[in-house]
A protein has these predicted regions:
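Short beta-strand or tight-loop elements
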Residues: 451-455, 497
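Domain-level recognition of nuclease-like catalytic cores that cleave nucleotide substrates
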Residues: 491, 495-521
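Mg2+/Mn2+-dependent nuclease catalytic core
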Residues: 169-173, 472-489
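A short acidic/basic microdomain associated with nuclease active sites
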Residues: 436-450
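Structural motif
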Residues: 148, 464-466, 500
Length: 521
């Protein structure tokens, strides 16, 4: 059996350790060359959690510290000749979660202390902003070189309270105060790099640093974090072959499975395909494809967000929108879309330049399945002992194309859903319908546009396409008639598959399916 060739840095985010201990490093140093050649001085990068931001920040630290030996054989080794050693202040804010104001001030104190030991502390420097200001100036005076400031996960202290106004305000004031010296420190700074998940416009980073380059949506930086398809198939090809052999798959089958699970991220209009690096590295190291990123902990703010905005998973599969709707500051959010995109639960699927229209969607199977598991308890009883029995019977019926039996299973099951989980709206029934089919990894879409309307749901099977119309307290015949009247079947006539239309009637009193009609085109 083939062995894994590379040594994978599971849980390691320090560039120095990766290079010194011989772990696989996917070279991203060409982006540092790009920054330096363009004279870029203040940079902000937004990427989802566990997506390689901290490793890139660590790489920048090693570069500006002049650690030439760590970069041997990498792209930047051909560019850099001088390797000037700058004083580097690297603040990791990822540990500042779930703090109140006192806890956050204590955390900032611990972040500043090591640099005050190095460069001293001035009299009268009490508050974090005063201390940061003094450290940068003394570092410059003592070394003769301008300082570099790296702030990793700058928004971590605020994300968990983003929708709790009374808790957010004091924490935001503390962070605003801490970041406030950066603008006036310009003469003492060589470079500033800030990472995060989202944008808090009222922090001084964005309101005062008017020369800040936000590279998060630029094509040329789409692969700055994460692993591109090219990087995967060149640097990890032997290991994909070894994994495939262990899983009784060909190389192509294994690559396709990795792609389905972890690929699909796009961070700009013309972005490369980007794989989730956390999951990919874990999978390659373990030799097993599993939901590592989603399973590593769903942030509490996401659960609050889904609840606050009553997020319907079926609408997330394809969201047509404009840039300002998802690339906006957290304080200005009136819907879940921006934070779902910035957190990695949605990504750019398509861009239409004529209308400057973006289509956002769920990036891959790992995220899709994770969201399904997260949302299903909102619509069904999570403690039902017969959930698995229902899903098994439902699954078998669907895969043998016995829609009659599948709907009978669904009718029986839905009648037992607790009353307090029901709201009787057509959207609610549509969501339950969608979730049950999606849980089986069947390709189903809701609200699918045709020339003069939207089909409630379209399900694609290997040899058959099903078009569904759902009605509440109306007849199945009415639902079937609407499919014909609105031309919902027309887009699929050229696909060469069986076309079946299904009208379904839900009874809000009985809280389940009351009738259905099935007709083949």
């Amino acid at each position: 059996m083939a062995k894994i060739v590379n040594k994978y840095p599971v849980g390691i985010q320090t560039f120095e350790e990766i290079r010194e201990k011989g772990y696989l490093y996917v070279d991203k140093t060409k982006y540092i060359v790009d920054f330096r050649e363009k004279g870029m001085k203040y940079i902000f990068l937004s990427r989802p959690r566990r997506f390689g931001k901290s490793l890139f920040a660590s790489t920048l630290q090693a570069y500006f510290e002049g650690r030439k030996e760590l970069f041997e054989g990498l792209a930047i080794a051909e560019y850099e000749k001088e390797w000037v050693k700058h004083p580097v202040l690297h603040f990791d804010m990822s540990g500042a979660k779930h703090f109140d104001a006192d806890g956050l001030n204590n955390y900032l104190n611990l972040q500043l202390l090591p640099y005050e030991k190095l460069y001293g502390k001035g009299e009268g420097e009490i508050y974090p902003n005063e201390r940061l200001d003094g450290i940068v100036k003394r570092a410059y005076e003592q070394t003769g070189e301008k300082a570099v400031v790296i702030i990793d996960e700058y928004d971590a202290p605020l994300l968990d309270v983003v929708h709790e106004k009374e808790n957010l305000q004091p924490l935001r004031r503390i962070m605003q105060n801490f970041y406030s010296p950066l603008k006036k420190l310009d003469p003492y700074l060589e470079f500033t790099f800030i990472t995060g998940i989202t944008k808090f416009s009222q922090l001084s980073i964005f309101s005062e640093l008017n020369n800040l380059d936000n590279i998060s949506l630029f094509d040329q930086y789409s692969a700055i974090c994460g692993i591109s398809k090219t990087e995967l198939t060149t640097q990890m090809k032997p290991d994909i072959e070894a994994m495939g052999e262990a899983l009784n798959m060909t190389y192509e089958e294994c690559l396709n499975e990795l792609t389905q699970f972890y690929d699909g991220y796009h961070f700009s209009e013309n972005s490369e395909d980007i794989f989730n690096p956390f999951s990919l590295v874990k999978a390659m190291n373990a030799g097993k494809i599993a939901p590592y990123w989603f399973g590593s902990g769903t942030p509490s703010f996401l659960l609050k967000l889904l609840d606050k905005y009553h997020v319907n998973l079926s609408t997330l599969e394809s969201q047509e929108t404009v840039l300002s709707s998802f690339d906006q500051s957290t304080e200005e959010m009136t819907e879940a879309l921006p934070l779902l995109y910035q957190s990695g639960y949605l990504t750019i699927k398509k861009y239409e330049p004529m209308f400057q229209e973006y289509t956002l969607g769920i990036p891959n199977k790992e995220v899709r399945d994770g969201l399904l598991n997260l949302l299903i308890p909102h619509y069904v009883n999570p403690r039902r002992s017969d959930n698995n029995a229902f899903l098994l019977g439902f699954c078998k019926a669907v895969y043998r194309n016995d829609i009659e039996a599948a709907l009978e299973h669904m009718r029986t099951y839905m009648a037992t859903i607790p009353y307090d989980l029901e709201n009787h709206s057509e959207k609610h029934y549509q969501t339950i319908f969608y979730l049950m089919f999606s849980f089986l990894n069947i390709y189903i879409r809701t609200e699918v546009k045709s020339a003069i309307g939207r089909a409630d749901a379209v399900m694609h099977m290997p040899d058959t396409i099903y078009v569904f119309e759902l009605k509440v307290d109306k007849s199945a015949d009415e639902a079937l008639a609407q499919i014909d009247e609105k031309g919902y079947m027309l887009p699929y006539h050229a696909e060469g598959k069986r076309l079946i239309k299904i009208g379904i009637s839900f009874d809000s009193t009985q809280r389940t399916i009351s009738d259905w009609k099935i007709k083949e085109e």
